[in-house]
């Protein structure tokens, strides 16, 4: 038994003896002691690092930038490999918009401002990619892909229905409706240029049909949300039809063809609204009939019967016949 030694020799001997007992066989005593020292240093370093993580972190310049850009929270997400290859980035991002909106709708009563902005920004982004004038040819989507796109838009609008009457959703819906009307002219122009250059137009034509479908979808939501905004958007369509009819008389055959096709696209949107079983939608569309009635009256006054027979197959005459067929008899008289 060792007794207390003020010089510490007894403690040193005890430690030395413990080291000798624990030292692995075949290992030099000096190397073993160095390894023990390194282990103690590593442990102290880990404890010191852990204590710094618990201390409040001072704000950095990056934090200030994030605050100024309205980013309220940064979440570090673990890297997650995709389970399958992304075949089409545009559809993938549109699907993300759909899934985010679906999740928000299931977990909360109403949508937050950022959720609404994220949704409509995603819709605008997708539509912009479908009518990029820099691309001679759009992506060729098969029937199943187009059905998927239509379904995504339909369900997104269904998720938005509960918030359709909110000022932000209403404003963005009208903006989207105006944008789709612009896309029709852009797409018709691209199709005409592609046809002249011998480039395919089938994929563009499919998207043209999709724009008509989407605009009618927007009208259905506005019919539920705001009759006033619905009437304004319908008025925009009819006024565009009037402009198209005017350009159909242009001396340039390319301009006549372009605006004739645009007239038909707008008519394909407007007249189903006029003849709709939705009383709200039909009533709103009927308030714009006067503009079309004036087109017929003015054209018949400017063209006598002899000239009308000579130009029976001209663009204005064909459009005039179409207008008379699509309007109610009481609207023509």
UniProtKB/Swiss-Prot annotation:
Pfam families: Mei4 (PF13971). InterPro entries: MEI4 (IPR025888). It is found in: Cytoplasm; Nucleus. The keyword rRNA-binding does not apply. GO terms for cellular component: cytosol; linear element; nucleus. GO terms for biological process: chromosome segregation; meiotic DNA double-strand break formation; reciprocal meiotic recombination. The keyword Mitochondrion does not apply. Keywords: Chromosome partition, Cytoplasm, Meiosis, Nucleus. Its main location: cytoplasm. Interacts with Rec7, as part of the meiotic recombination initiation complex. Required for correct meiotic chromosome segregation and recombination. Accessory protein required for Rec12 activity, which is involved in formation of the double-strand breaks (DSBs) that initiate meiotic recombination. Belongs to the MEI4L family. This is Meiotic recombination protein rec24. The lineage of its organism: Eukaryota, Fungi, Dikarya, Ascomycota, Taphrinomycotina.
């Amino acid at each position: 038994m060792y007794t207390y030694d003020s010089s510490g020799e007894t403690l040193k001997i005890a430690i030395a003896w413990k080291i000798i007992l624990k030292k692995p066989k075949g290992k030099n005593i000096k190397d073993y002691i160095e390894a023990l020292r390194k282990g103690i240093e590593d442990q102290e370093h880990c404890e010191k690092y852990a204590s710094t993580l618990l201390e409040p972190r001072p704000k950095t310049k990056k934090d200030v930038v994030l605050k100024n850009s309205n980013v309220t929270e940064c979440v570090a997400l673990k890297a997650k490999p995709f389970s399958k290859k992304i075949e089409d980035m545009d559809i993938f991002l549109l699907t993300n918009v759909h899934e985010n909106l679906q999740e928000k709708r299931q977990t909360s009563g109403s949508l937050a401002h950022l959720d609404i902005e994220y949704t409509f920004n995603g819709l605008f982004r997708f539509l912009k990619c479908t009518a990029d004038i820099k691309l001679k040819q759009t992506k060729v989507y098969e029937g199943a892909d187009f059905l998927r796109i239509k379904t995504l838009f339909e369900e997104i609008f269904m998720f938005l229905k509960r918030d359709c009457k909110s000022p932000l959703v209403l404003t963005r819906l009208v903006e989207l409706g105006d944008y789709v009307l612009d896309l029709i002219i852009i797409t018709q122009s691209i199709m005409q240029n592609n046809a002249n250059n011998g480039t395919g137009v089938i994929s563009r034509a499919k998207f043209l049909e999709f724009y008509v479908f989407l605009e009618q979808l927007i009208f259905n939501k506005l019919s539920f949300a705001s009759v006033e905004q619905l009437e304004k958007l319908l008025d925009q369509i009819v006024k565009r039809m009037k402009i198209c009819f005017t350009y159909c008389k242009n001396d340039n055959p390319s301009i006549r063809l372009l605006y004739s096709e645009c007239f038909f696209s707008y008519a394909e949107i407007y007249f189903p609204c006029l003849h709709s079983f939705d009383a709200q939608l039909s009533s709103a569309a009927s308030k714009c009939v006067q503009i079309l009635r004036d087109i017929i009256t003015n054209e018949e006054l400017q063209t006598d019967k002899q000239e009308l027979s000579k130009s029976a197959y001209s663009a204005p005459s064909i459009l005039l016949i179409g207008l008379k067929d699509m309007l109610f008899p009481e609207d023509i008289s």
